Design a protein with these regions (language model features):
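Short, hydrophobic/proline-enriched secondary-structure or compact coil segments at domain edges
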Residues: 16-34
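Activation segment signature within eukaryotic-like protein kinase domains
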Residues: 175-176
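C-lobe/activation-segment region of protein kinase-like
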Residues: 204-255
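Conserved structural core of kinase catalytic domains
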Residues: 95, 105-106, 120, 128-171
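Catalytic-loop of the protein kinase fold
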Residues: 187-204
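Conserved hydrophobic alpha-helix
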Residues: 179-186
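ATP-binding glycine-rich loop module of kinase domains
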Residues: 32, 37-118
């Protein structure tokens, strides 16, 4: 059984007014089947994990990859994938937390693919370039969506602002104009992003920017879907005691 990922969860304790370690989350794989486990031990590297001492639970295939009834409706990514692309797949490290989105990450991928089909037919320089989705057939010869392929960019606006003191100052007026143009284009298509923040704006080496991450995007006047705003797995509410605590996952060290 292969350990795919592990992260430490730190909770903000309102009484202590500080972050404290809560648990380590582990994602494992055996063949095509994925599993998850949590442990109260603070594990810093995958080599420190004894999988025989943790309670391993399966992640249902239907929760990871959704069935596609009509594959012809979806643009398929190039095969093989270009070297300069970003492959977005379901995030499993937050699986089975308190939100519906955390229990059905495959639904978010399918929804974003549907939105991207609108965007690929209506391209804009300030909207990420979508290359298509990856469809694979399971053992029952049923097509499932496994991931989404996009052009890869250098860094997020969040990173660019954080590193600005070491780089050329950011032209904020140009940046804001690009974001505004991208959002106007979306709204012109009758779409609302619902999760615009500096981590969902990417930039290239020339500070040209694009808006990314459309799994929260919905038609205008539509209901919010499984995911919206910052409550997307980066912050996941849990209640290990009587008080509400926010969990912040940090990547464990590699080993």
């Amino acid at each position: 059984m292969e350990i795919c990922e592990q992260k430490q969860a730190f909770v903000f304790d309102e009484e202590e007014d500080d972050l404290v370690f809560h648990h380590t989350k582990i994602i494992l794989r055996q063949g095509d089947q994925y599993f998850y486990a949590t442990t109260n031990q603070r594990i810093r590297a995958s080599s420190d994990i004894d999988i025989n001492k943790v309670d391993i639970k399966p992640i249902l295939t239907d929760h990871i990859s959704q069935v596609v009834d009509d594959p012809a409706k979806f643009t398929q990514a190039p095969d093989p994938l270009p070297n300069d692309c970003y492959l977005k797949q379901p995030c499993l490290i937050h699986y089975d937390e308190d939100t519906e989105a955390s229990r059905h990450p495959g639904d978010l991928v399918l929804h974003e693919a549907e939105i991207c089909e609108i965007l690929i037919k209506n391209s804009h320089p300030n909207i990420v370039q979508y290359l298509g989705c990856i469809l694979e057939k399971d053992r029952d010869n049923i097509s499932r969506i496994k991931g989404l392929c996009f052009v890869k960019y250098l860094k997020s606006l969040e990173q660019r602002l954080r590193e600005e003191k070491d780089e050329t100052p950011l032209d904020r007026q140009r940046c804001l104009a690009g974001i505004e143009n991208g959002m106007k284009h979306l709204h012109g298509l009758g779409l609302v992003h619902n999760d615009l923040n500096p981590s969902n704006v990417m930039m290239d080496a020339q500070d040209n920017l694009v808006i990314i991450d459309f799994d929260s995007c919905q038609p205008e006047f539509g209901k919010l879907g499984l995911k919206g705003g910052l409550r997307d797995g980066r912050w996941a509410a849990i209640q290990p005691s009587a008080k509400t605590i926010c969990t912040v996952y940090q990547r464990s060290g590699s080993g």
